């Protein structure tokens, strides 16, 4: 994962991912160079309380580990936002 600290255009241009089913479907499609926003806030703490978020973030990290996508952390208005670029 890498951190980006420029404008918030990444956030505005992203597609919101709220379910594991949606996150999984992203990788069944041909790569489109789109940005998917999957969380804003304290990811580690929030994953402990939210099983769906835990599954989504583990999927994105696993896909990034094998080179299928990039996981990006970005500060927007003092909030930490997490994205996957695929």
Language-model segment annotations:
Residues 2-52:
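Short amphipathic alpha-helical interface segments
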Residues 15-17, 61, 84:
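Short, intrinsically disordered low-complexity segments
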Residues 23, 60, 69:
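Functionally constrained cores in energy, signaling, and assembly domains
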Residues 29-31, 64, 77:
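A generic structural signal for short, non-catalytic loop/turn and secondary-structure boundary residues
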Residues 36, 70, 82:
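A broad, low-specificity signal marking well-ordered, structured residues that form hydrophobic/aromatic
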Residues 49-65:
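Short amphipathic alpha-helical interaction segments
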Residues 65-74:
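A short, conserved structural fragment
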Residues 74-86:
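Short, cationic-aromatic polyanion-contact patches
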